[in-house]
Curated annotation (Swiss-Prot):
Keyword Secreted: no
Gene: cotB
Biological processes annotated in GO: sporulation resulting in formation of a cellular spore
Signal peptide (UniProt feature, chain positions): none
Basic and acidic residues bias: start-end ranges: 229-248
Region: Disordered, residue numbers: 224-364
Protein name: Spore coat protein B
Length: 380
């Protein structure tokens, strides 16, 4: 470059720098449109970047990509709370202040990515993301950077296989003969096998398509197909869920088995108890019936004893009556005979017989027998 042209560029840079300083602490709009367009307070102007205090965060723009900065004269008095701002001499040093923090590269578009900054080379920065794992960004193509709320999922992960190379060319050499993804999206995005060529150029081979690329024009590169890291993570989560489901199912089945065993035991014990209670009730009923039978037998025996005693007593009474009647009848038979015999022997025998003819009829043998029969029948 000629001295005149260098002087022209230096003069333009000085004038542009002075122009930016004149708008410091004013409300401006960076970019007039597109995903990178943001409105806020211009808080810092550095050699190759500016700091814009937006509504919720501070955005650091690399000056070589800023196409326009417009002052908002209508809202020049609007106050925006200023957060703590990083202070660095240049954009590369600014990125170095954000190592191991959650950041966002670019505010929108296909090359916008959020993740944890894990490494910084001379001309690239390595960002650990959820979707693509570690992505290597060419610093020359980063339009803006801002702090982002930490993603717990990313914070808990330890990135594996981070290429800690000095520059982007060494990163490309490490990724040769591997499947890589060039750029995050848009018409320039491509996937394929990276093949090394002479003169610092590389070739991407995908099926029948062969493309020659130069690392300087690559915005970002990552190992493997795009989204493979997220798919692998989802697969691991699904496997984990399946294992948890299996464990829970096995626990439920073992629990149901133990509950069935306990229910069987309880049923068995209830059957034993019922059988025992049945036996006890049967034994009680049998004892009761035996007691009743004993009582009834005792009662019957007592009744039979009473009846036998009553019968025997009645028989004995009958016998006694019969014997008494018989004795009385014998005595009565004998008495008239004896009386007759005595009367016959006495001197007044004939006269007495004549005088007491009626008594002779009353105390005859037949009269006595009839009298006994009458009284016997009447009594029994």
């Amino acid at each position: 470059m000629s001295k005149r042209r260098m002087k022209y560029h230096s003069n333009n840079e000085i004038s542009y720098y002075n122009f930016l300083h004149s708008m410091k602490d004013k409300i401006v709009t960076v970019y007039r449109g597109g995903p990178e367009s943001k409105k806020g307070k211009l808080t810092a102007v550095k050699s190759d970047y500016i700091a814009l205090q937006a509504e919720k965060k501070i955005i650091y723009y690399q000056l070589e990509h800023v196409k326009s900065i417009t002052e908002d004269t209508n809202n020049s008095t609007t106050t925006i709370e200023t957060e703590e701002m990083l202070d660095a001499d240049d954009f590369h040093s600014l990125i170095g202040h954000l190592i191991n923090q959650s950041v966002q590269f670019n505010q929108g578009g296909p090359e916008s990515k959020k993740g944890r900054l894990v490494w910084l080379g001379d001309d690239y920065a390595a960002l650990n993301t959820n979707e693509d794992g570690v992505v290597y960004f060419n610093i020359h193509h980063i339009k803006s950077i801002s702090k982002h709320e930490p993603d717990l999922k990313i914070e808990e992960q330890t990135p594996v296989g981070v290429l800690e190379a000095d520059d982007l060319s060494e990163v490309f050499k490490s990724l040769t003969h591997k499947w890589v993804s060039i750029n995050r999206g848009g018409p320039e995005a491509i996937e394929g096998i990276l093949v090394d060529n002479a003169d610092g150029h590389y070739t991407i081979v995908k099926n029948q398509e062969v493309l020659r690329i130069y690392p300087f024009h690559i915005k970002s590169i990552s190992l493997g197909p795009k989204g493979s890291y997220k798919k692998e993570d989802q697969k691991n989560e699904q496997n984990q869920e399946d294992n948890n489901d299996k464990d829970s199912n096995s626990f439920i089945s073992s629990k149901s088995y133990s509950s069935s065993k306990s229910s069987k035991r309880s049923l068995k014990s209830s059957d034993d108890q019922s059988s025992k209670s049945g036996r006890s009730s049967r034994s009680k009923s049998s004892s009761k019936s035996s007691k009743r039978s004993l009582k009834s037998s005792d009662y019957q025996s007592s009744k039979s004893g009473r009846s036998s005693r009553s019968k025997s007593s009645s028989k004995s009474s009958k016998r006694s009556l019969k014997s008494s009647d018989y004795q009385s009848s014998k005595s009565s038979k004998r008495s008239p005979r004896s009386s007759d015999y005595q009367s016959s022997r006495s001197p007044g025998y004939s006269s007495s017989i004549k005088s007491s003819g009626k008594q002779k009829e009353d105390y005859s043998y037949e009269t006595i027998v009839r009298t006994i029969d009458y009284h016997w029948k009447r009594k029994f």
